[in-house]
From Swiss-Prot:
Modified residues (Phosphoserine): S240
Modified residues (N-acetylmethionine): M1
Domain remark text: The N-terminal domain has an alkylhydroperoxide reductase activity. The C-terminal domain mediates interaction with GATOR2 through which it regulates TORC1 signaling.
The reaction(s) this protein catalyses: a hydroperoxide + L-cysteinyl-[protein] = S-hydroxy-L-cysteinyl-[protein] + an alcohol
Description of post-translational modifications: Phosphorylated by ULK1 at multiple sites. Ubiquitinated at Lys-166 by RNF167 via 'Lys-63'-linked polyubiquitination in response to leucine deprivation: ubiquitination promotes SESN2-interaction with the GATOR2 complex, leading to inhibit the TORC1 signaling pathway. Deubiquitinated at Lys-166 by STAMBPL1, promoting the TORC1 signaling pathway. Ubiquitinated by RNF186; ubiquitination mediates proteasomal degradation.
Cross-link (Glycyl lysine isopeptide (Lys-Gly) (interchain with G-Cter in ubiquitin)): K166
UniProt KW Oxidoreductase keyword: yes
Ranges for region N-terminal domain: 57-230
UniProt-recorded name of the protein: Sestrin-2
Organism: Bos taurus
Similarity comment text for this entry: Belongs to the sestrin family.
Length: 471
């Protein structure tokens, strides 16, 4: 995204975020102010900004000459960011079926579902820069009927994508004055899922607004004590709790090694056992929720005006005492065999870039864990990806979900589910309490997996509905 210039910021002063995404904590003035409320400024600025400059060149990112905070944090993983940036530019800046101002308005609608003031403010500025009608920023009721018709599918994609049916697609494509073409709808659906998942990344990494153009520091939430806010280094292992952290890492690595050996020896569970373990994991995910003392985010009226049915949110795919929708068997509609080919037919420019971005996140590895190097992390990355798909009701027949419980600690599960399903409830405490002994860049890596797995899950449901509509 592009940071608004000073003129646009002044014009949108009432809309732009001013105190960061962690709305439920007190603020104190600190300096220098970094791009994240969760990550020490010296770590993210040094590694993130340097990585971006080396791999892409700062001028390739921003015509304004400024790099936003999201890009700097994501720049901790420059190989992934390259793929992300290509798709982001295609969706929002390259010629396509939808006018540029419409794309930014759709992005506003998507980000508002999660009350993500960082993204809403950024896209408001870009909406005006691309010639958008300022009246539309007063709320959905001032936008064209054609855009308002996206509200229902925006709501479902953001919170319960498994409810999307071919009837939702038919209603949008039905011939009429305010109908969508299939090419327009595909671009809109990809953009909606892109922004929903990007909101997860913003909240999951504690991304802060850029501040005023003069660069004066804005209020920032106080950092917790250093032993909580920064994962221990090798030296800190000599301090209280350090040996316990080291043992946790060693235990995780041993479980990973055992799983990899069993896979090589073909000691996998039977199909019935794997299905049973998926159902167990899905049921147990009901218990993986944020603490009851987490307050509901304050509903910002400047964002609620872009939202219809604001009380609609994520509900567990399997709920006690209710008739659950059928499990989405990944083998019946895969990204590789079905989703990708459909996107390639209807939105060829986006299909290849989407696939590259998914692969960049899924395969990204530095073969390190905390203070250890030369580690094969494939089973851990797969467990995180498949757990995210599990909470969205997607099952892989060839995956043993017993691995999820062996590799993902409860604090990590709580964090993953919160960031993926209701990111606006994410807190610094959640971020600090999983993988305390890991580097911040490794936690950002988890957020990249979250972003892409969530986006792919929602897209699979939407593309399956389109396929059913077309057949």
């Amino acid at each position: 995204m592009i940071v608004a210039d000073s003129e646009c910021r002044a014009e949108l002063k009432g809309y732009l975020p001013g105190a960061g995404e962690e709305q439920r904590e007190s603020r104190v003035r600190r300096g220098p102010r970094g791009p994240s409320a969760f990550i020490p400024v010296e770590e993210v600025l040094q590694e993130g900004a340097e990585s971006l400059e080396q791999h892409l060149g700062l001028e390739a990112l921003m015509s304004s000459g400024r790099v936003d905070n999201l890009a700097v944090v994501m720049g901790l993983h420059p190989d992934y960011f390259t793929s992300f940036w290509r798709l982001h530019c295609l969706l929002l800046h390259t010629d396509g079926p939808l006018a540029n101002s419409w794309r930014h308005y759709i992005a506003i609608m998507a980000a508002a579902r999660h009350q993500c003031s960082y993204l809403v403010g950024s896209h408001m500025a870009e909406f005006l820069q691309t010639g958008g009608d300022p009246e539309w920023l007063l709320g959905l009721h001032r936008a064209p009927e054609k855009l308002r018709k996206l509200s229902e599918i925006n709501k479902l994609l953001a919170h319960r994508p498994w409810l999307i049916t071919k009837e939702h697609i038919q209603a949008l494509l039905k011939t009429g004055e305010h109908s969508w073409s299939l090419a327009e709808l595909i671009q809109a659906l990809v953009l909606l899922t892109h922004c929903h998942s990007l909101a997860s990344f913003v909240f999951g990494c504690g991304i802060l607004p850029e501040g005023d153009p003069e660069g004066s520091p804005a209020p920032q939430a106080p950092s917790p004590p250093s032993e909580q806010s920064t994962p221990p280094s090798r030296d800190s292992l000599n301090h209280s709790g350090g040996f316990e952290a080291a043992r946790d890492v060693e235990a995780l690595m041993e479980r990973m090694r055992q799983l990899q050996e069993s896979l090589l020896q073909d000691e996998g569970a039977s199909q019935e056992e794997m299905e049973s373990r998926f159902e167990l994991e899905k049921s147990e995910s009901l218990l993986v929720t944020p603490s009851v003392d987490i307050l509901e985010p304050f509903a910002n009226p400047d964002m609620l005006c872009f939202v219809e049915d604001p009380t609609f949110g994520y509900e567990d795919f399997t709920r006690r005492g209710t008739q659950a929708p059928p499990t989405f068997r990944a083998q019946d509609y895969t990204w590789e065999d079905h989703g990708y080919s459909l996107i390639q037919r209807l939105y060829p420019e986006g299909g290849q870039l989407l696939d590259e971005k998914f692969q960049a996140a899924y395969s990204l590895t530095y073969n390190t864990i905390a203070m250890h190097s030369g580690v094969d992390t494939s089973v851990l990355r797969r467990a995180i990806w498949n757990y995210i798909h599990c909470v969205f009701g997607i099952r892989y027949d060839d995956y043993d979900y017993g691995e999820v419980n062996q590799l993902l600690e409860r604090n990590l599960k709580v964090y993953i589910k919160t960031v993926a399903c209701y990111p606006e409830k994410t807190t610094r405490r959640m971020y600090n309490h999983f993988w305390r002994h890991f580097r911040h860049s490794e936690k950002v890596h988890v957020n990249l997996l979250l972003l892409e797995a969530r986006m792919q899950a929602a897209l699979l449901y939407a593309l399956r509905a389109i396929t059913r509509y077309m057949t």
